[in-house]
From Swiss-Prot:
GO terms for molecular function: 4-amino-4-deoxy-L-arabinose transferase activity; mannosyltransferase activity. It catalyses: 4-amino-4-deoxy-alpha-L-arabinopyranosyl di-trans,octa-cis-undecaprenyl phosphate + lipid IVA = lipid IIA + di-trans,octa-cis-undecaprenyl phosphate. It is found in: Cell inner membrane. Belongs to the glycosyltransferase 83 family. The gene is arnT. It comes from Pseudomonas syringae pv. syringae (strain B728a). It comes from the Bacteria. This is Undecaprenyl phosphate-alpha-4-amino-4-deoxy-L-arabinose arabinosyl transferase.
């Protein structure tokens, strides 16, 4: 059994390296998230201010600091490059895969269910996609997973092991809070309390829970006090704007209907989505088992809680996917043992059919109305991805009992190659930092920088290691930070651009990166002087203006 587990772990580690780590440095940072998190964490490195997050030199209080610390650490260790920015997400996702493996082992002590749990979780589309994407959700998901794994260990241990597990609950809650806020406390409570009530062990929760609470507070308190001292308005803004208004406000950011997460849960577990009905059916039939009850509560209660919120983003459901992977693995392995292949066969055939039709559609469009313009490499990679996905899922459909795991190969191939297989039209408009790199030598000598797009501005700031980009007729999420008196003059309105440009050029060379897609953006682009050196890529333009004659 030990040899089997070692082989399983070796396979998972190989998949982690090939699918999660290797692709990290081969495509530009996606806007708006990746460039934002890269720049904020880089600014921590250069400013030495590890307490209060700043975005392009402006106060940015949408999240606490700990998530930025890990991204900054990645850049400190691996360099201020694409790999360094993304490594925190990849490691957090990889460690969550390990947690799925460990929790399945603790619950069932079955190597096949352990391996299936980790493999399913690692190949879920949402999980694998976020592993190569620099944001805070993989980190927050990891700390939530640690919290609930430690809770399960705590309620199934005695003596010092139980105390250590409760202490780990507190540590993980504390770091989770410093990563993304109060949700790190809410999710464990809404899962643990009903579970202990159902198991008639509420007294145990009341006895040991305060230990976890005290440790969580002890972990958070130094930073919480430090940021209050440095930025007295932080907690008001973070609590009311980022939590209360987003949860219940009529004008909540990213507002979506209550049912938003239902179809999204199906999409999140692709390429295993057709196993979902059988998984939920079996879990409901076995809901009286403590292990299944715990996993069901972990899956459903956060989903219900998040559905009540007015503001919703797809990645918010990431903490629900580890229990889903375990429930699905339990169903899958038991069906394999009984020789039941219907659900697996249907899953493989459905996935292969959809992707094959996508491949046919791509070839047809390429012949009739090309998606790829003189991009043989990108087109070849797209065909490889679609063909590989089709083949991997067709194997499951044809031989479901022996090739049940092959959809994971298709998922990992997709995640590894898709960013490089996209058309230039998408890449050029959504990843501006390679465009900046190609003209970095000219931009580096500029004394003033300007942009009308926050994503492009943050890419420029990160690549040039300069947060002082002036914001031309755009502020968006930086509106709060721009309201402080010590940063006045960072925004440039349309009616003031001539005066700003004249003053800036009197001091030295001026570098500008502009987006010219909407009518308003085109108007902003037209308002700039015509005597600059201009470079265009997609709907982005870089302009370099020489210093004006004195």
């Amino acid at each position: 059994m030990i040899h089997v587990r070692h082989r399983h772990l070796a396979l998972l580690l190989l998949a982690f390296v090939l699918a999660y780590l290797l692709p990290l440095g081969f495509h530009g940072l996606w806007i708006p998230d990746e460039t934002r998190y890269a720049q904020i964490s880089q600014e921590m490195l250069y400013s030495g201010n590890w307490i209060a997050p700043h975005f392009m030199g402006l106060r940015y209080f949408e999240k606490p600091a700990a998530g930025y610390w890990l991204i900054a650490l990645g850049q400190q260790v691996f360099g201020e490059n694409l790999f360094g920015v993304r490594i925190a997400s990849a490691l957090a996702s990889g460690l969550s895969v390990l947690l799925a493996y460990l929790l399945a082992g603790k619950i069932w002590n079955d190597p096949r269910k352990q391996f299936a749990s980790a493999l399913l979780f690692m190949s879920f589309g949402f999980v694998a996609g976020q592993a190569g994407y620099a944001n805070l959700d993989p980190q927050f998901t990891f700390w939530t997973n640690v919290t609930l794994l430690a809770f399960w260990y705590a309620v199934h241990s005695v003596g010092r092991a139980r105390l250590a597990a409760w202490a780990l609950v507190g540590v993980a809650c504390g770091i989770g809070f410093m990563t993304k806020g109060f949700l790190a406390w809410a999710l464990p409570v809404i899962i643990a309390l009903p579970y202990m009530l159902c198991q008639r062990r509420l007294a145990e929760l009341l006895r040991f829970g305060p230990l976890a609470v005290l440790i969580a507070i002890a972990v958070c308190l130094p930073w919480a006090l430090a940021i209050h001292q440095q930025e007295p308005d932080y907690w008001r803004y973070f609590f009311w704007h980022e939590h209360i208004r987003r949860f219940a406000g009529d004008n909540a950011q990213h507002a979506q209907p209550w049912w938003f997460y239902m179809p999204l849960l199906v999409a999140a577990c692709v390429p295993w989505a057709l196993l979902l009905p059988a998984t939920l059916q079996q879990a409901w039939q076995e809901k009286n088992r403590p292990d299944i009850a715990f996993l069901l509560l972990w899956l459903l209660l956060p989903l219900a809680f998040l559905s009540l919120s007015k503001g919703k983003l797809p990645t918010y459901i990431l903490p629900c996917l580890l229990p889903l992977a375990l429930l699905m693995a339990n169903t899958l392995v038991e069906r394999l043992d009984r020789g039941h292949s219907t659900a697996l066969r249907a899953n493989g055939i459905f996935n292969a059919t959809v992707t094959f039709l996508g491949l046919v559609a791509l070839i047809y469009l390429q012949l009739e109305q090309p998606v790829y313009e003189n991009e043989p490499m990108h087109l070849s990679l797209a065909i490889i991805v679609l063909f590989g996905w089709t083949l991997a899922n067709a194997l499951q459909g044809l031989r479901p009992l022996t090739c049940w795991a092959t959809p994971a190969l298709g998922s990992w191939l997709l995640i590894a190659l898709l960013p490089a297989a996209l058309p230039n039209d998408v890449i050029n408009n959504k990843t501006p930092d390679p465009f900046v790199v190609r003209h970095q030598a000219e931009l580096a000598g500029c004394t003033q920088l300007l942009s009308n797009d926050l994503g492009a501005a943050s890419a420029l700031a990160w690549r040039l290691k300069r947060p002082d980009v002036a914001l031309f007729n755009t502020w968006g999420e930086l509106e709060y930070g721009l309201g402080y008196p010590d940063v006045q003059g960072r925004e440039v309105r349309l009616q003031d651009i001539d005066a700003w440009m004249k003053n800036a050029r009197s001091q030295g060379r001026v570098g500008v990166i502009m987006r010219g897609k909407s009518d308003e953006e085109l108007k902003e682009l037209e308002s700039l002087p015509r005597d600059g050196q201009r470079y265009d890529e997609g709907n982005l333009a870089i302009l370099v203006y020489e210093k004006s004659a004195s």
